[in-house]
């Protein structure tokens, strides 16, 4: 029996940094197993656990499997994949590693066919940055294989992001089709609407003018590829004029996540004064 461990990745917010091409531990683990298959190494999955939240890029993944193949042969495949990854991710996740160790035993495993079907299904599933808005130079469509867990069932959780419902539907349809090819169940849950940039927003102009008048600061307007509650409001009330603002936050959805307290206080005071002006 053997344990595979993928680590050394940065992770991060699956919307805010998805365009940085960081490694996804679940995707990498899947790749390792698929290359074992390509080298005619049979395996029986016993456990698979990667990621904590569907909206965070997974930093780690651990999996245990049984195989009758020689340890040296398996190790050679793992090292080849690891070296390829280090080259491919040297500009975005240079510390990536894949570790193979022997373990004593496994409680339960699934069959070779079931194991290969699961890995093949995951290998086909799209992941990461898909398209960007050329007008705003902002990620427009993405998805993230955030959590994979093997208990009584084998569950895979994705977060799909786009301000356009049609684009989200297309990605959802692809995942559903791939799942059906392997007789897996696909469930769409926690869907929330996005909202597109409104060039004619009067509220945004009022806010920008207010900050310029009161603080002498010219704000830089930016879009964000992340899920916001404002999208839910906009989905229910199509005519709403919406802007978002917030404090400085760093390394969101990682152990290093932090908030600039001074910027929070400044943002809050600015919002209060702006509301008084309206």
Residue ranges and their predicted role:
Residues 22-39, 69-70, 116-122, 129-132, ...:
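His/Asp/Glu-rich mid-to-C-terminal helical/loop segments that flank catalytic regions of hydrolases
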Residues 54-62, 107-110, 196-209, 232-236:
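Short glycine/threonine-rich loop-to-helix capping motif typified by GTGT followed
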Residues 1-160:
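Midchain, well-structured core segments that form catalytic/ion-binding scaffolds
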Residues 133, 140-142, 146-155, 159, ...:
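Zn-dependent metallopeptidase/amidohydrolase metal-coordination segment
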Residues 138-226:
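Substrate-recognition/cap regions that form aromatic- and gly/pro-loop-enriched pockets
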Residues 32-35, 77, 81-84, 174, ...:
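Generic, well-ordered alpha-helical scaffold segments in large soluble proteins
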Residues 46, 99-101, 187, 220-222, ...:
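General small-molecule cofactor/ligand-binding pocket signal
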Residues 10-14, 193, 249-252:
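A short, flexible beta-alpha/helix-coil linker loop
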């Amino acid at each position: 029996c053997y344990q595979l461990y993928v680590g050394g990745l940065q992770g991060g917010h699956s919307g805010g940094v998805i365009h940085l091409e960081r490694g996804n531990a679940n995707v990498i683990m899947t790749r390792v197993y698929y290359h074992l298959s390509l080298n005619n190494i049979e395996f029986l999955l016993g456990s698979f656990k990667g990621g904590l939240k569907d909206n965070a890029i997974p930093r780690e993944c651990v999996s245990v499997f049984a195989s009758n193949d020689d340890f040296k042969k398996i190790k050679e495949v793992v090292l080849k994949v690891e070296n390829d990854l280090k080259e491919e991710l040297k500009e975005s996740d240079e510390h990536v590693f894949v570790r193979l160790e022997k373990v004593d035993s496994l409680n339960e495993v699934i069959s070779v066919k079931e194991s290969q079907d699961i890995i093949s299904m995951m290998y086909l599933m799209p992941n990461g940055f898909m398209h960007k808005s050329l007008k705003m130079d902002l990620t427009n469509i993405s998805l993230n294989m955030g959590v994979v867990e093997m208990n009584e069932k084998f569950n895979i959780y994705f977060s799909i992001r786009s301000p356009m419902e049609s684009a989200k539907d297309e990605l959802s349809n692809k995942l559903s089709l791939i799942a059906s090819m392997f007789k897996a169940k696909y469930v769409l849950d926690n869907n929330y609407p996005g909202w597109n940039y409104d060039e004619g927003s009067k509220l945004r102009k009022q806010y920008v003018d207010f900050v310029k008048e009161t603080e002498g600061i010219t704000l830089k307007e930016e879009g964000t590829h992340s899920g916001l509650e404002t999208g839910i409001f906009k989905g229910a009330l199509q005519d709403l004029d919406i802007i978002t603002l917030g404090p400085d936050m760093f390394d969101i959805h990682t152990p290093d996540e932090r908030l600039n307290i001074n910027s929070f206080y400044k943002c809050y005071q600015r919002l209060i004064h702006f509301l008084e002006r309206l």
